Amino acid sequence: MIDRAEKNRIMQKSSDDGEFWMEFEDFKTNYDKVEICNLTPDSLTDDTKRKWEVSMFEGSWVRGSTAGGCRNFIDTFWTNPQFKLNLEDADDEDDQCSVIVALMQKNRRRLRKEGLDLETIGFTVYQAPDDEDHLGKDFFRYNGSKARSKTYINMREISERFLLPPGKYLLVPTTFQPHHEADFLLRIFSEKKADTLEMGNTIEADLPDPPMPSPPEEENDEEKGLRRLFEQISGSDQAISARELQQVLNGVLSRRKEVKFDGVSLNTCHSIINLMDVDSSGMLDFQEFKVFWDKLKKWIMLFLSFDTDRSGRMSAYELRIALKAAGMHLNTKLLQLLALRFADSNYDIDFDDYLTCIVRLENMFRVFQAMDQRKRGVVSMNFQQFLLLSMNV
């Protein structure tokens, strides 16, 4: 028992609020670990309360697009969400910047009822270049981390406190294994104001202008072969429908042994006609088809650069790079949606789905650019226009 004098000295008061006292020797006997919980990152001292600057982001790890796993999986690690942190001002006490990173899994208690347990999560911090775009595989292959979570662990939330020199940093939150899905909340606390942004958030297209009519040039052997096949299928009207286009493409592509595919679908051919049908006839004449053929050859070479094993498939995780090479930059949300739409159960995209994806995207970009005459990034349409646009893409 504690005598009255000792109680007065330590100002102990009996109240029914869960507080209790024990001797230190008893404490050491019964406990081997103490966790001090602080509801905010503010100072625990009696000094003047300091407000921390807070940045907060919500995101997702989605199979086939942003569930890249930890650094052990270098081929997909770079596809994880990336966040830029610009620390300009050092702390008041020294020339370093105090940063607290907290990564929380969302909705896991609800998902546990469905048999899904907590994912094993962590994060890594890199010195960042000035580039504002989503960084690719080579950056992480040749650059080491500056800080990281102490371990990957299956907890609802993990947090670490770092002292970093002023500069630009890249923060990559991940699950340990690739292809594991979860929603997350990322909070970044800093003593001084810091600029933060999610990388790869740009939506834009750098597409060549449609070719202008020009005097016919002498056709090479490839074009002569295309014309013969085109005229054979088109008949007297010298134009082909979507079904006839399917015959032409499957006939031509089947001769190219480097392209392994099961055939171009009718839906893909409808999308091609919507993109290339300049005169709105619902069909393609030979000049329109020839322009498309030039596009298709470039898209085939692009696909083959990712289909390294010549299986007729490319990894859905590389869709960001493939579309960028084709002149189209998409943000993380859109890439996640495309992976869900076009990737198979092995997170691969076959040639026909790749072609459908790239044709529809270019068509949508061109339609939007034509409607956005003031170049403000905003268009207005009524319900009928929306329906017509949706049915023609």
Language-model regions: role of each:
Residues 1-280, 286-291, 295-308, 320-326, ...:
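Accessory/interaction modules and long regulatory regions
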Residues 312-316, 321, 326-349:
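Extended, charged alpha-helical interaction scaffolds
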